[in-house]
Amino acid sequence: SDIASKKISCELISPMDATYYLGTMLGGYNVEPLISLLDDPECGDAAVKALSNTLLVFDAFNDIAEKSKSSENASKVLKSWAEAEWFLSKPEVPERIDTIIFKVPGETNTDDLSPAPDAWSRPDIPLHALSMYKMPREGLTNEPLKEIEELKKKGLPVALVGDVMGTGSSRKSATNSVLWHIGEDIPFIPNKKTGGICIGEKVAPISFNTMEDSGTLVFEADVENLNMGDVISIFPAKGEI
Protein backbone atom coordinates (compact mmCIF):
# COMPACT_ATOMS: atom_id res chain seq x y z
CA SER A 1 0.00 0.00 0.00
CA ASP A 2 2.93 2.34 0.67
CA ILE A 3 4.16 1.81 -2.89
CA ALA A 4 0.70 2.40 -4.36
CA SER A 5 0.29 5.61 -2.36
CA LYS A 6 3.84 6.67 -3.31
CA LYS A 7 5.02 6.89 0.28
CA ILE A 8 7.95 4.79 -0.84
CA SER A 9 9.31 3.93 -4.28
CA CYS A 10 10.43 0.59 -5.65
CA GLU A 11 12.29 -0.12 -8.86
CA LEU A 12 10.58 -3.51 -9.23
CA ILE A 13 6.95 -2.60 -8.52
CA SER A 14 5.24 0.52 -9.85
CA PRO A 15 2.31 2.21 -8.04
CA MET A 16 -0.03 0.76 -10.69
CA ASP A 17 1.37 -2.73 -10.13
CA ALA A 18 1.01 -2.30 -6.37
CA THR A 19 -2.63 -1.27 -6.76
CA TYR A 20 -3.27 -4.33 -8.90
CA TYR A 21 -1.64 -6.62 -6.33
CA LEU A 22 -3.73 -5.08 -3.55
CA GLY A 23 -6.78 -6.08 -5.57
CA THR A 24 -5.74 -9.74 -5.55
CA MET A 25 -6.15 -9.94 -1.76
CA LEU A 26 -9.96 -10.30 -2.08
CA GLY A 27 -10.68 -8.23 1.02
CA GLY A 28 -9.54 -7.27 4.48
CA TYR A 29 -6.46 -5.11 4.94
CA ASN A 30 -6.37 -4.08 1.29
CA VAL A 31 -9.75 -2.32 1.35
CA GLU A 32 -8.84 0.91 3.13
CA PRO A 33 -5.75 1.58 0.96
CA LEU A 34 -7.76 0.94 -2.20
CA ILE A 35 -10.50 3.35 -1.10
CA SER A 36 -7.88 6.02 -0.50
CA LEU A 37 -6.58 5.44 -4.04
CA LEU A 38 -9.94 5.91 -5.78
CA ASP A 39 -9.26 9.56 -6.55
CA ASP A 40 -5.56 9.13 -7.25
CA PRO A 41 -4.80 10.55 -10.74
CA GLU A 42 -2.51 7.65 -11.64
CA CYS A 43 -4.03 4.66 -9.84
CA GLY A 44 -7.70 5.62 -9.49
CA ASP A 45 -8.97 3.49 -12.37
CA ALA A 46 -6.96 0.50 -11.16
CA ALA A 47 -8.43 0.96 -7.68
CA VAL A 48 -11.94 0.94 -9.17
CA LYS A 49 -11.23 -2.34 -10.93
CA ALA A 50 -9.67 -3.83 -7.81
CA LEU A 51 -12.55 -2.86 -5.51
CA SER A 52 -15.15 -3.95 -8.07
CA ASN A 53 -13.87 -7.50 -7.63
CA THR A 54 -13.50 -7.26 -3.85
CA LEU A 55 -16.49 -8.38 -1.79
CA LEU A 56 -15.07 -8.76 1.72
CA VAL A 57 -15.32 -5.04 2.47
CA PHE A 58 -17.57 -5.29 5.55
CA ASP A 59 -18.26 -1.84 7.10
CA ALA A 60 -16.06 -0.17 4.49
CA PHE A 61 -19.11 -0.39 2.21
CA ASN A 62 -20.47 2.61 4.10
CA ASP A 63 -17.24 4.52 3.49
CA ILE A 64 -17.49 3.92 -0.25
CA ALA A 65 -21.18 4.84 -0.28
CA GLU A 66 -20.39 8.11 1.50
CA LYS A 67 -17.44 8.77 -0.80
CA SER A 68 -19.65 8.18 -3.86
CA LYS A 69 -21.44 11.47 -3.13
CA SER A 70 -18.36 13.35 -4.30
CA SER A 71 -16.29 10.73 -6.13
CA GLU A 72 -17.12 9.41 -9.58
CA ASN A 73 -14.80 6.46 -9.10
CA ALA A 74 -16.51 5.46 -5.85
CA SER A 75 -19.83 5.58 -7.72
CA LYS A 76 -18.37 3.28 -10.36
CA VAL A 77 -17.51 0.73 -7.67
CA LEU A 78 -21.06 0.77 -6.27
CA LYS A 79 -22.50 0.43 -9.77
CA SER A 80 -20.20 -2.51 -10.52
CA TRP A 81 -21.30 -4.26 -7.33
CA ALA A 82 -24.96 -3.58 -8.07
CA GLU A 83 -24.58 -5.13 -11.52
CA ALA A 84 -22.65 -8.10 -10.10
CA GLU A 85 -19.81 -7.64 -12.55
CA TRP A 86 -17.55 -9.62 -10.21
CA PHE A 87 -19.75 -12.65 -10.90
CA LEU A 88 -20.77 -12.09 -14.50
CA SER A 89 -17.14 -11.61 -15.56
CA LYS A 90 -16.27 -15.15 -14.51
CA PRO A 91 -15.96 -17.89 -17.17
CA GLU A 92 -19.20 -19.67 -18.00
CA VAL A 93 -19.65 -23.30 -17.02
CA PRO A 94 -18.62 -25.35 -20.08
CA GLU A 95 -21.38 -27.09 -22.01
CA ARG A 96 -19.30 -30.27 -21.93
CA ILE A 97 -16.52 -31.39 -19.59
CA ASP A 98 -14.35 -34.39 -20.44
CA THR A 99 -12.74 -35.98 -17.40
CA ILE A 100 -10.95 -39.15 -16.35
CA ILE A 101 -12.10 -41.10 -13.32
CA PHE A 102 -10.24 -41.86 -10.11
CA LYS A 103 -12.68 -44.19 -8.36
CA VAL A 104 -12.60 -45.23 -4.72
CA PRO A 105 -15.00 -48.08 -3.94
CA GLY A 106 -17.19 -47.96 -0.85
CA GLU A 107 -17.40 -45.09 1.59
CA THR A 108 -14.89 -42.27 1.70
CA ASN A 109 -15.19 -40.33 4.94
CA THR A 110 -13.36 -37.15 5.79
CA ASP A 111 -10.84 -39.11 7.86
CA ASP A 112 -9.78 -40.92 4.68
CA LEU A 113 -9.09 -37.57 3.05
CA SER A 114 -7.83 -35.71 6.11
CA PRO A 115 -6.66 -38.27 8.71
CA ALA A 116 -7.03 -37.19 12.33
CA PRO A 117 -3.49 -38.38 13.28
CA ASP A 118 -2.20 -35.88 10.71
CA ALA A 119 -4.39 -33.02 11.94
CA TRP A 120 -1.27 -31.11 13.04
CA SER A 121 -0.42 -30.51 9.37
CA ARG A 122 -3.86 -29.32 8.22
CA PRO A 123 -2.84 -25.64 7.93
CA ASP A 124 -0.13 -26.72 5.44
CA ILE A 125 -2.42 -27.99 2.69
CA PRO A 126 0.25 -29.42 0.32
CA LEU A 127 1.86 -31.32 3.20
CA HIS A 128 -1.39 -32.53 4.73
CA ALA A 129 -2.72 -33.64 1.34
CA LEU A 130 0.05 -36.24 1.19
CA SER A 131 -1.86 -38.21 3.83
CA MET A 132 -5.00 -38.58 1.71
CA TYR A 133 -6.01 -42.26 1.41
CA LYS A 134 -2.90 -43.26 3.39
CA MET A 135 -4.73 -46.19 4.98
CA PRO A 136 -4.82 -49.30 2.73
CA ARG A 137 -8.25 -50.25 1.49
CA GLU A 138 -9.75 -52.82 -0.84
CA GLY A 139 -10.09 -51.70 -4.43
CA LEU A 140 -7.40 -49.04 -4.19
CA THR A 141 -3.70 -49.31 -4.98
CA ASN A 142 -1.07 -48.89 -2.27
CA GLU A 143 0.02 -45.63 -3.88
CA PRO A 144 -3.23 -43.83 -4.76
CA LEU A 145 -1.66 -40.39 -5.05
CA LYS A 146 0.78 -41.67 -7.66
CA GLU A 147 -2.15 -43.15 -9.55
CA ILE A 148 -3.83 -39.74 -9.59
CA GLU A 149 -0.64 -38.28 -11.06
CA GLU A 150 -0.57 -41.00 -13.71
CA LEU A 151 -4.18 -40.24 -14.66
CA LYS A 152 -3.32 -36.55 -15.00
CA LYS A 153 -0.80 -37.45 -17.68
CA LYS A 154 -3.74 -38.27 -19.96
CA GLY A 155 -4.27 -34.53 -20.25
CA LEU A 156 -7.75 -34.45 -18.72
CA PRO A 157 -9.01 -33.22 -15.36
CA VAL A 158 -9.37 -36.01 -12.81
CA ALA A 159 -12.75 -36.63 -11.20
CA LEU A 160 -12.95 -38.23 -7.75
CA VAL A 161 -15.74 -40.82 -7.83
CA GLY A 162 -17.08 -42.97 -5.01
CA ASP A 163 -20.13 -44.74 -3.69
CA VAL A 164 -20.46 -42.60 -0.57
CA MET A 165 -18.42 -39.42 -0.27
CA GLY A 166 -17.62 -36.99 2.51
CA THR A 167 -19.17 -38.40 5.66
CA GLY A 168 -17.54 -37.11 8.84
CA SER A 169 -16.79 -33.73 10.35
CA SER A 170 -13.48 -32.57 8.84
CA ARG A 171 -15.06 -31.44 5.60
CA LYS A 172 -12.94 -28.33 4.96
CA SER A 173 -9.54 -29.95 5.43
CA ALA A 174 -10.82 -32.97 3.48
CA THR A 175 -11.90 -30.71 0.62
CA ASN A 176 -8.54 -28.93 0.71
CA SER A 177 -6.76 -32.28 0.33
CA VAL A 178 -8.93 -33.42 -2.56
CA LEU A 179 -8.56 -30.15 -4.43
CA TRP A 180 -4.81 -30.08 -3.90
CA HIS A 181 -4.62 -33.23 -6.01
CA ILE A 182 -7.38 -32.65 -8.60
CA GLY A 183 -8.11 -28.91 -8.45
CA GLU A 184 -6.74 -25.82 -10.17
CA ASP A 185 -4.34 -23.15 -8.93
CA ILE A 186 -5.82 -19.94 -7.54
CA PRO A 187 -4.01 -16.86 -8.90
CA PHE A 188 -1.97 -15.07 -6.21
CA ILE A 189 -3.03 -17.53 -3.47
CA PRO A 190 -0.29 -20.12 -2.88
CA ASN A 191 -0.76 -23.58 -1.42
CA LYS A 192 -4.50 -23.75 -2.02
CA LYS A 193 -6.63 -24.79 -4.99
CA THR A 194 -10.16 -24.51 -6.32
CA GLY A 195 -12.32 -26.34 -8.86
CA GLY A 196 -12.16 -30.08 -9.28
CA ILE A 197 -14.89 -32.64 -9.92
CA CYS A 198 -16.44 -35.01 -7.38
CA ILE A 199 -19.20 -37.53 -8.09
CA GLY A 200 -20.82 -39.77 -5.51
CA GLU A 201 -23.79 -42.10 -5.39
CA LYS A 202 -24.36 -40.22 -2.15
CA VAL A 203 -22.47 -37.13 -0.97
CA ALA A 204 -22.76 -36.00 2.65
CA PRO A 205 -24.58 -32.63 2.71
CA ILE A 206 -21.94 -30.71 4.66
CA SER A 207 -19.17 -31.95 2.38
CA PHE A 208 -21.34 -31.22 -0.66
CA ASN A 209 -21.79 -27.61 0.48
CA THR A 210 -18.12 -27.19 1.37
CA MET A 211 -17.00 -28.48 -2.01
CA GLU A 212 -19.46 -26.19 -3.79
CA ASP A 213 -18.16 -23.23 -1.79
CA SER A 214 -14.63 -24.20 -2.84
CA GLY A 215 -15.56 -24.08 -6.53
CA THR A 216 -15.93 -27.82 -7.07
CA LEU A 217 -18.38 -29.36 -9.52
CA VAL A 218 -19.92 -31.89 -7.13
CA PHE A 219 -23.06 -33.92 -7.72
CA GLU A 220 -24.77 -37.24 -7.04
CA ALA A 221 -25.18 -39.85 -9.76
CA ASP A 222 -25.28 -43.58 -10.37
CA VAL A 223 -21.60 -44.56 -10.26
CA GLU A 224 -21.97 -48.34 -10.62
CA ASN A 225 -20.74 -48.33 -14.22
CA LEU A 226 -18.05 -45.69 -13.68
CA ASN A 227 -14.65 -47.32 -13.29
CA MET A 228 -11.09 -46.29 -12.58
CA GLY A 229 -9.50 -44.72 -15.66
CA ASP A 230 -12.73 -44.32 -17.62
CA VAL A 231 -13.03 -41.15 -19.67
CA ILE A 232 -16.48 -39.61 -19.41
CA SER A 233 -18.21 -36.49 -20.68
CA ILE A 234 -20.28 -34.42 -18.26
CA PHE A 235 -23.01 -32.11 -19.56
CA PRO A 236 -23.72 -29.85 -16.55
CA ALA A 237 -26.69 -27.96 -17.98
CA LYS A 238 -28.41 -31.17 -19.04
CA GLY A 239 -27.54 -33.03 -15.85
CA GLU A 240 -26.14 -35.89 -17.90
CA ILE A 241 -23.02 -38.08 -18.03
For the regions a language model picked out, list residue spans one by one:
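Glycine/serine-rich anion-binding loops at beta->alpha junctions
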Residues: 157-180
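Structural detector for internal amphipathic alpha-helices that build alpha-solenoid repeat scaffolds
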Residues: 1, 13-27, 36, 45-56, ...
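A glycine- and small-aliphatic-rich helix-loop capping segment at beta-alpha/alpha-beta transitions
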Residues: 175-185, 214-221
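Short, conserved "active-site rim" segments that organize catalytic pockets and cofactor/ligand binding
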Residues: 104-156
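Amphipathic alpha-helical scaffolding segments comprising HEAT/armadillo-like alpha-solenoid repeats
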Residues: 1-7, 25-38, 57-67
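Phosphate-handling active-site elements
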Residues: 180-202
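Acidic, glycine-rich flexible loop/linker segments
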Residues: 205-241
